[in-house]
Amino acid sequence: MSISKAIAADLLEIKAVSLSPSQPFTWASGIKSPIYTDNRVTLAYPEVRSQIEGAFAELIKTEFPEVEVIAGTATAGIPHGAIIADYLKLPFAYIRSKPKDHGAGNQVEGRVAKGQKMVVVEDLISTGGSVLEAVAAAEREGADVLGVVAIFTYELEKANSKFADADVKLATLTNYSELIEIAKETGYVTKEELELLKKFKENQETWQA
């Protein structure tokens, strides 16, 4: 089994990802979805966490070999980013969703030199808006952001377009396609539910159970 599928299987097993095609979730954006993800759950499982961070380290070495500093997004990207930085023996920083309203007013916390090559760590990519705002904040403070890594992506077309428009490279450990394939192979969903899950990938904006 590939590392991508192995991680997808782990996310299902520990219920970091929940699938409910017949009784969909409603995201904050208003999108009706057959899937809900809370990757913070992975932190409670040492073996899963270790596999994720090791896979992240290998992914970064392959996709972004020039990296000089790891940055996590607040708050979900911080624990993963800190562990990855330790794996890679690199400096770590984190990026707030907005600047502090007191003190120095920092948005990027830590020491990042002008032109330092950075990879930003996020746990989940949905529409991509928040992590791209973090990338922009890091770049305003002088970082040279090589790209973004994440555990999981819903593969929304909106996110793909945003990353393309921003000219930011995205690399993830696993994705929606791999996850529903694993769900099928393990009997996690019925044939009818699988079809609903596939339809969501084809058109998330208009999908209905």
Swiss-Prot record:
Entry EC no(s): 2.4.2.10
Role played: Catalyzes the transfer of a ribosyl phosphate group from 5-phosphoribose 1-diphosphate to orotate, leading to the formation of orotidine monophosphate (OMP).
Binding locations of orotate: 126
Example GO molecular function: orotate phosphoribosyltransferase activity
Catalysis performed (reactions): orotidine 5'-phosphate + diphosphate = orotate + 5-phospho-alpha-D-ribose 1-diphosphate
Keyword annotations of the record: Glycosyltransferase, Magnesium, Pyrimidine biosynthesis, Transferase
GO biological process, one term: pyrimidine nucleobase biosynthetic process
Gene3D superfamilies per UniProt: 3.40.50.2020
Cofactor: Mg(2+)
Source species of the chain: Lactococcus lactis subsp. cremoris (strain MG1363)
Binding site for 5-phospho-alpha-D-ribose 1-diphosphate: 96, 100, 102, 122-130
Biochemical pathway: Pyrimidine metabolism; UMP biosynthesis via de novo pathway; UMP from orotate: step 1/2
Subunit structure: Homodimer.
Protein's UniProt keywords contain Magnesium: yes
InterPro entries named among the record's database cross-references: OPRT, Or_phspho_trans_dom, PRibTrfase_dom, PRTase-like
Family stated for the protein in its record: Belongs to the purine/pyrimidine phosphoribosyltransferase family. PyrE subfamily.
Classification via CDD domains: PRTases_typeI (cd06223)
Descriptive protein name: Orotate phosphoribosyltransferase
Tagged with keyword Transferase: yes
Pfam families reported for this sequence: Pribosyltran (PF00156)
